[in-house]
């Protein structure tokens, strides 16, 4: 297992009601996808940009 196992966690909005567009790595599609983050809670599969998500979670060949 890699140190980036959190990339395979589901996207979690969290319990707050904010509206923060974020990105998560989807293990189903193998791509970084947009979701809405509530502002608190959640997990580490939560990135401010698709680029940050990709550089962290895309499998290295």
From Swiss-Prot:
InterPro entries associated with the record? Kunitz_BPTI, Kunitz_BPTI_sf, Prtase_inh_Kunz-CS, TFPI/VKTCI-like
* Gene3D superfamilies xrefs: Pancreatic trypsin inhibitor Kunitz domain
Please give the chief subcellular localization of this protein.
secreted
Here the disulfide bonds are: 7-57, 16-40, 32-53
Q: Which PROSITE patterns match?
A: BPTI_KUNITZ_1 (PS00280), BPTI_KUNITZ_2 (PS50279)
GO MF entries: serine-type endopeptidase inhibitor activity
Report if keyword Thylakoid is assigned: no
BPTI/Kunitz inhibitor domain span:
7-57
Q: Which UniProt keywords apply?
A: Disulfide bond, Nematocyst, Protease inhibitor, Secreted, Serine protease inhibitor
User: Where in the chain is the site Reactive bond for trypsin?
Assistant: 17-18
Compartment annotation: Secreted; Nematocyst
Transmembrane stretches, start-end:
none
Entry GO CC: extracellular space; nematocyst
Which family does the record assign?
Belongs to the venom Kunitz-type family. Sea anemone type 2 potassium channel toxin subfamily.
This chain's function reads: Protease inhibitor.
Q: What is this protein called?
A: PI-actitoxin-Axm2b
